[in-house]
Amino acid sequence: MKQYQDLIKDIFENGYETDDRTGTGTIALFGSKLRWDLTKGFPAVTTKKLAWKACIAELIWFLSGSTNVNDLRLIQHDSLIQGKTVWDENYENQAKDLGYHSGELGPIYGKQWRDFGGVDQIIEVIDRIKKLPNDRRQIVSAWNPAELKYMALPPCHMFYQFNVRNGYLDLQWYQRSVDVFLGLPFNIASYATLVHIVAKMCNLIPGDLIFSGGNTHIYMNHVEQCKEILRREPKELCELVISGLPYKFRYLSTKEQLKYVLKLRPKDFVLNNYVSHPPIKGKMAV
C-alpha cells in the first residue's frame, strides 16, 4: 500500500493548513486520486493494523439499510449493548443534538443506499450491472440534499460508480472529506470488499478500485502518527476470502443474493496472509 504513504507525503509537502468544523485544524489538499488493481491483491493498509472487523461490520450495516448504531453493534459484537463502534461518538454528539435517541443516527448511508426517495439503489445498480453491463449509469449516491440536515453526519464518501470492463468489475468512489489517518484505510478496505461482493453477485472478477478525494486532510492531532506511518516499510498485499455463501448464489435473484450477504458476519471475511505493523492510535475529530 505504498499509494497510501505517497498520499501522506504529498499532503505534508504540498498541503495547506486550515481550520475545520471540529476545531482541530488540518493540513489539507483538494483533489487527490489513488488506484489499485484488485487482481494483484487486496488493498489492506499494512503500515498500521487495519480495524478489519469494524470495517466489515459497517459495510454490512450500510447494505442492510439500517441507520441505528445498535444494529451495527449487533453485527460487530453480537450484542446490542456491549462493545464500541466507529459511530458511537457521532451518536453521542451530533445525533443526540438533533434530538435522536435509542441509537438512531438519522437518514445516513444505509437509508440512502436502500431507500433514496423510495429507490433501493443497491438492488437497482446490481440488476443494472447484470442486465446492462456497458451502461454508464451504475451509480449509488448517499448525498441527498433534502435530508442532510437530519443526518448525524452528512456522508463523507458521497457516491460511487461501477464499471464493467471485459469481465472485470471496477469501482470508483468520490469522497468530499477524507480523514487520511483514521478514515481512508477503512474506506479503501470497505469499497474493495464491496467490489468483491458485487462481483460475486454478478459473476464478474474484481478489477480496479479508484479513490477520488475532495478535501483530503491530516488532522493536526494525527501529524505524528502519519510521520510514523512514513517511517514504516509496507508489507505485501493479502487476499480476501469470503465464505458463508451457498453454491447456488450466483444463480439467485439480486434480492435473494442480498439476503444471504446480509446474513454474513465479519468472521466470514478473511484476509489471508495479512501481515501489518502494529496499530497506531489516534482520536477521531467529531
From Swiss-Prot:
| An annotated Gene Ontology molecular function | thymidylate synthase activity
Q: Does the keyword Methyltransferase apply?
A: yes
InterPro entries the record matches: Thymidate_synth/dCMP_Mease, Thymidate_synth/dCMP_Mease_dom, Thymidate_synth/dCMP_Mease_sf, Thymidylate_synthase, Thymidylate_synthase_AS
Tell me how this protein assembles: Homodimer.
User: According to its UniProt record, which protein family does this protein belong to?
Assistant: Belongs to the thymidylate synthase family.
Q: What else is noted?
A: This enzyme is also expressed by the thyA gene of E.coli; the phage and host synthases exhibit striking dissimilarities in both structure and function.
Name of the featured protein:
Thymidylate synthase
